[in-house]
Amino acid sequence: MSQDLLPGVTGVLALADGAILQGVGCGAVGDAVGEVCFNTAMTGYQEILTDPSYMAQIVAFTFPHVGNVGVNGEDVEQITGVAETAARGALFRDVPTVQANWRADGDFDAWMKARGVVGLAGVDTRALTRKIRETGMPHGVIAHSPDGQFDLAALVAKAKAWAGLEGLDLAKDASTTQTFTWDEGLWSWPEGYAKLDKPKYEVVVIDYGVKRNILRALAHVGARATVVPASTSAEDILARNPDGVMLSNGPGDPAATGQYAVPEIQKLVASGKPVFGICLGHQMLALALGAKTVKMEQGHHGANHPVKDLTTGKVEIVSMNHGFTVDTASLPAPVKETHVSLFDGTNAGIALDGKPVFSVQHHPEASPGPTDSLYLFERFAGLMDAAK
């Protein structure tokens, strides 16, 4: 079916509804299947593409110019180093530009090749974003072939056959398999990343696909993180006698991961230890407290999302990256809603009455994005102080 393509086309996106987007292939040669979403951030493409929360997804960047600051070894959010546990494809309006930044130590296109990320440039990302906004996040296959040869019918069939994210426990693949400690803090100019010399708190982080900047933000408030696999039991965690427990972000369906994680989270909540959940960790805490989660039509992906803190009345601009949400109507009486999205009114935070337990749907650690809600790590530290 290559005759259906325009001259010079070396990349396509085939959607499950039969739509074909044409352009110039970049990054890795080959194809990848996943859920197509859009991200509205203007910066931070390297952090986005290495965020484990994007596992099994193809990201369309709404900002047209990508690649101008290159890539480096510091802005990688994964801790596992397994490229397959992050975004598998990327869509751009313009061909990625040549880097010009003092921190760059590599070319974006070559970096995508090395990581196996299939790219497609020259796409009408505005039209694709409107399509996603109106009809939901489609299943798609992104393909790059330098000779311009594609079996379009086979690509569409592959997109149709993909089962999607619902029911998928991806956290087990994104998680570390070995326990380790972390003591690197947040970055600042001109010092670079801080070093935690004298930890004030010991925090166990359950890794469902944790971002490095969450660990750095913990170090910023004096917490040394011990990162454990997603399947770690509550008994093993409590045996370490931590000051608090962090439920990390991660990919996939929270209900699927919750099959083994929720019973352990319930034990941690019952222990009285301070618990702080972020993104997937927020959703699984909600499940552990008796609420439900549901799949979203278009999800929230970007660094410009307004969220209201109902406890203070303050509006914050935050980073979000999720395709599932907590069903507010399902929250049981002891659980109060603390944050809401001002885009669509969906839940963005909860707290448990009478317990040092809370979580948020957004990413207070940013990377990329604003740091309006970085104070939540201080709130967590305050709960650990009170519990000592």
Swiss-Prot record:
Q: Name the Gene Ontology molecular function terms of this record.
A: ATP binding; carbamoyl-phosphate synthase (glutamine-hydrolyzing) activity; glutaminase activity
Which residues are named in the active-site annotation? C279 (nucleophile), H363, E365
The protein's matches in SUPFAM superfamilies, at most eight in alphabetical order, are given as: Carbamoyl phosphate synthetase, small subunit N-terminal domain, Class I glutamine amidotransferase-like
Return the EC number. 6.3.5.5
- Its annotated pathway? Amino-acid biosynthesis; L-arginine biosynthesis; carbamoyl phosphate from bicarbonate: step 1/1; Pyrimidine metabolism; UMP biosynthesis via de novo pathway; (S)-dihydroorotate from bicarbonate: step 1/3
What is the recorded function of this protein according to its Swiss-Prot or TrEMBL entry?
Answer: Small subunit of the glutamine-dependent carbamoyl phosphate synthetase (CPSase). CPSase catalyzes the formation of carbamoyl phosphate from the ammonia moiety of glutamine, carbonate, and phosphate donated by ATP, constituting the first step of 2 biosynthetic pathways, one leading to arginine and/or urea and the other to pyrimidine nucleotides. The small subunit (glutamine amidotransferase) binds and cleaves glutamine to supply the large subunit with the substrate ammonia.
What is known about its subunit structure?
Answer: Composed of two chains; the small (or glutamine) chain promotes the hydrolysis of glutamine to ammonia, which is used by the large (or ammonia) chain to synthesize carbamoyl phosphate. Tetramer of heterodimers (alpha,beta)4.
Q: Which NCBIfam families match?
A: CPSaseIIsmall (TIGR01368), PRK12838.1 (NF009475)
Family that this chain belongs to: Belongs to the CarA family.
Q: What is this protein called?
A: Carbamoyl phosphate synthase small chain
